[in-house]
Amino acid sequence: HNLLAFGPPGCGKTLALQKFPGLLPLLPMEESQSVTRIHSLAGLLPPSVSIMRKGDFRMPHQTASIEGICGGGVNCRPGEISLAHNGVLFLGEAAEFRTSVLQMLRVPLETGTITLSRAGRSTVYPANFQLLMAANPCPCGNYGVEGKICLCSARSVEMYWRKFSGPLLDRVDLRVCVSAVEKESKNDGEENENFSTGALRKKIAVAVKKQRERGIKNSRLSPQQISEFCGLNEEQERFLENQRKKNSLSQRGVSACLKIARTIADMENH
């Protein structure tokens, strides 16, 4: 599932998302070969590596151009979104990226491919990646933070968030507000064991296995497949409908809730 984590500077959102490479599962051979071919074509396959068993974790700089992100140039080289195929594209300080770059992500997020055109020739590269974004709540980073003063005008905050247009955010299932880290309590160590890298990796492996058996990732379930794999009883349907009205969820938002619920159930082996 695509994710946007936003919160004040120093709250740990970027550090947490940079842990994702350790959670990535091994790929089936067909997907491994696809990832390997793309990196070989881009000249980024290490000489000592014959095949990449995991998807890549790509972290482009905020100054990256559309060509750098999507690909192109004289030889139509694959860009960051194709290098992140079957892996993760992480945009740290996402609001600092050009608006045009962020908007270009919409089509590959929907289709899983990117079409590059050069001198009357078109090249289609795979671009089925998980998008992770980290952002501050406003340009100065203090908006809504207890004990801090936000120096931004209402207009500047509005323009800041306009970079994340509705169509882009519609394709981001998870939007998480991250609070500043508080001092650990005595019980935190025991609780954190359930969320250690090793424990999470095992849960992810279970979820990935279930999704491969279905033949599709939960994030890409169609409306018909949601009905098939995310069936609800009457009580659950009433609860979801109440939440839809309470939070003014669109149909896409309701679908995202069901997909996420299916993933959580998969991780718990239900």
Which sequence ranges carry the predicted segments?
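Residues immediately C-terminal
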Residues: 89-90, 96-97, 183
